[in-house]
Amino acid sequence: MNVTTTRKDLMIVNMGPHHPSMHGVLRLILTLDGEDVIDCEPILGYLHRGMEKIAENRTVIQYLPYVTRWDYLATMFTEAITINGPEQLGNIQVPKRASYIRIIMLELSRIASHLLWLGPFMADIGAQTPFFYIFRERELVYDLFEAATGMRMMHNYFRIGGVAADLPYGWIDKCLDFCDYFLTAVSEYQKLITRNPIFLERVEGVGIIGGEEAINWGLSGPMLRASGIEWDLRKVDRYECYGELDWEIRWQKEGDSLARYLVRMSEMTESIKIIQQALEGIPGGPYENLEIRCFDIEKDPEWDGFEYRFISKKPSPTFELPKQELYVRVEAPKGELGIFLIGDQSGFPWRWKIRPPGFINLQILPQLVKRMKLADIMTILGSIDIIMGEVDR
């Protein structure tokens, strides 16, 4: 009697780069045994544009419009890190009013980023309704951005020594009204989502990361705080005026996808608390340190140089970066966004190394999805929160 043997063949599947759950042009090469994930290999680089090399051939002001294309959903943070480096290299003092305006814009940008994480994350695991709800509040944030900066996205608002323009008349009252309304919207999200049994089935206990493991992988932001580590650069470095405001670090100890969801939801309410304090305590005075223009150096082009022959005009005066090196960082919505900057006494940086949080956080994805089901990949990847413009640079 012949006994039939079951033959098991592994299947290799390409997920992305055009898959709607990839949040950009990420490609995953999956090895599957039925529904079980045996191996996962991320393929990056489809959105690589050479942002670091572009920075080394531009002045800081020329480079500002480029940086908003890294994380194009939280552009205020990429602008902040771009001007913080030269400010620290040159010992440039930022007026208190400008620092408060920056904090307000950064926290509004954090809220907008978390909202546009929440909607697609819920859609990935099968809940369509929140995807439409989040755009209602996100439009209000973009209305505030448009009134203050002139742009809904890609704002180009931060400047060395301050910001590009002061807040318009009536903007503070409009922003305070938004803060009061948004707290009710967050409570509506929590009633709709947090205790939903289907949602809990999809996220609870999925993609668990321990605290020590998160540190060893170099994770940051909500990924780190959801694993029981109370670490927030706004508290640690106290950049801008965060040290003058009263707020708390939101964290969870479970380390799963549910914990990362809870951290981001509570971070939005903390951002509202920060914005309200900043709006009520914003001082008067200038919004830009005009003394910085005294450091601008004008160079005469050579008669056979590029400017004379092709541009037909003199280059504008620009701030020279001192011959030093510096690492500067901010707490972006996805984690620690940093820049390693080397100046060489010229208008162009000698080295501009970007430390993107999404790229570092994405490293742990293959380990998290192994021995999980195929459907859990969307949950885990969505809970990491990546933007491929920032990952590939």
Curated annotation (Swiss-Prot):
The keyword Acetylation does not apply. Its main location: plastid. The keyword Thylakoid applies. It is found in: Plastid, Chloroplast thylakoid membrane. It is an enzyme of class 7 (translocase). One of its GO terms (cellular component) is chloroplast thylakoid membrane. One of its GO terms (biological process) is photosynthesis, light reaction. SUPFAM superfamilies: HydB/Nqo4-like. It comes from the Eukaryota. Its EC number is 7.1.1.-. Keywords: Chloroplast, Membrane, NAD, NADP, Plastid, Plastoquinone, Quinone, Thylakoid, Translocase, Transport. One of its GO terms (molecular function) is NAD binding. It is a peripheral membrane protein. It catalyses: a plastoquinone + NADH + (n+1) H(+)(in) = a plastoquinol + NAD(+) + n H(+)(out); a plastoquinone + NADPH + (n+1) H(+)(in) = a plastoquinol + NADP(+) + n H(+)(out). InterPro entries: NADH_Q_OxRdtase_suD, NADH_UbQ_OxRdtase_49kDa_CS, NDH1_su_D/H, NiFe-Hase_large. NDH shuttles electrons from NAD(P)H:plastoquinone, via FMN and iron-sulfur (Fe-S) centers, to quinones in the photosynthetic chain and possibly in a chloroplast respiratory chain. The immediate electron acceptor for the enzyme in this species is believed to be plastoquinone. Couples the redox reaction to proton translocation, and thus conserves the redox energy in a proton gradient. NDH is composed of at least 16 different subunits, 5 of which are encoded in the nucleus. Belongs to the complex I 49 kDa subunit family. This is NAD(P)H-quinone oxidoreductase subunit H, chloroplastic.
